[in-house]
Amino acid sequence: MTMSKNYPHLLLGVAFLGVSLLSCAPPEAAEERFDVVEATIPEMQRAMEEGSVTSRDLVEAHLLRIALYEERVNAAIAINANALEEADRLDQERAAGQVRGPLHGIPVALKDNIQTTHMPTTGGALAFEGFVPPYEATLTANLREAGAIILAKTVMTELANFIAAGMPGNYSAVGGFGLNPYDPRRDPREGRNDGRPVMGTGGSSSGIGTAMSFWAANVGTETSGSILSPANATMLVAIKPTVGRVSRYGVIPITADQDIAGPMARTVTDAAVLLGVLEGVEPDPHDPATQRCEPPSGGDYTAFLRADGLQGARIGIPRASYYDSVQVPGTDRFRGGMSDEARALMAEAIQILEAQGATIVDPADIPSVMDPDPENNLLTSGGSSVLSYGMKRDFNAWLATLGESAPVKTLTELREWNLAHADAGALKYGQARLDESDEIDLEEARAEYEADRARDLRLNGEHGIDEVMIDLQLDALLFPGSGSAGIAARPGYPTVIVPFGFIEPSGREMPEGFDAKPQPMGVSFTGMACSEPRLIELAYAFEQATMRRVPPPGMR
């Protein structure tokens, strides 16, 4: 059973219960109540171990926050109406001495392109509204087996932002517009006043609900930037894993070449806990890519949470393009760079890294960015058919796994359905990307795709991140915000982003009397394939030295 966007008898009941309890409780009880706002997963586990709180209490507390604030931010597409029953069962297991692990009884949320059999999986597409798939994703099963309670499905950019160019982050026909809790106002500017947020949420995953403490953490997916950019926009930690680290079976795809799921959380600790559960300890036979990386002993990434993790580390600063503008070879154009305010924030981050014992290698420019040969230069590489080709190949293959229950059987049928239901809101921003992908002849376009894929791997991996890290013996590259998203996504390399500060928005002229608010900005540690353990060490040490995350204002 699922609660739809029409909210929600369950939420209203929980809200009423919460208000009643608050009004009846003596002052000393109020002080003793467990506060879920900004609470970490280990803190929740400790409270349950001590008997001061139950999983039911945690679910009720999170549902109460959703009931109080969801209308202001629109974080969820669906709520699990059986969450309290699941919590009761897990509480009974705990009472019997059966604790499954660090996620036992913890409420989490999934992006709505991750299959669940107890809630619909829509990808935000109207054609899939109410659709409950015949099987659940491997990562969903891993979470359930670990005792996690999947409390909700999050808003997302429709079909992971592969339906139309110009679609705002966290908009979908099913979910509407998600709003950034650091400024939950809508954009007042002419031409942009269609309901979209004035402060971007990133996309296509959503960090809104985790930032708001609607649940302990959530799982996003990324093809290029879709975990990192929403984490950056909502002051979250996120781990975008190596492609293959987490099974993609049962996740609505764009392309198997780059798709990956990963944790979004308020702390590095919580993200590390979640990553271990998502990965599992054995490769998934449904996803051969899961053989790429070895999991850590016992699947436990918390072993890498070292406060001294920066001691002796070598961190590279890829100045060209990512910090400073650089001329594109053979042209008079310049690419990249950042605002003075962002530059100052990154300079502060670098100073902190040095103070924590890291050696800063500056510059540590990406060789393919600096290569004078246009054939070997990342900035002149032009477009790539990899995503469009992959969408045609992999989306149709995914639809075939759904059997007769699928609302549509092919990408062509989805396009036709959307056209037939345009008046119902299926095509607010069109479907140009779907059209482009579906018109590809996979056999005729194979050679172009393979050449583009080889170029992507060479310029971003072999002649990019690999070359600079090997030559300079680096542990990681430090990028501003989610700036590493593209270059790390193409070869499928990992990144960990950590909240760090705020910057004034640039290039956003607002109507008189409407003051734009500062927007969050994090820092990212990127490495080569399967380097998550080292990146977690670095990110945790940086987080512990800074502790810059702040919860959204006015939402407590």
List the predicted regions and their residue ranges:
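Acyltransferase
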Residues: 59, 88, 300-306, 338-365, ...
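Short glycine/serine-rich loop/turn segments
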Residues: 104-261, 286-292, 318-320, 324-325, ...
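An N-terminal boundary/leader segment
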Residues: 7-89, 95, 343-358, 412-416, ...
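Glycine-rich, small-residue loops and helix-cap segments
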Residues: 51, 105, 145, 151, ...
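N-terminal secretory signal peptides that target proteins for export/translocation
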Residues: 1-7
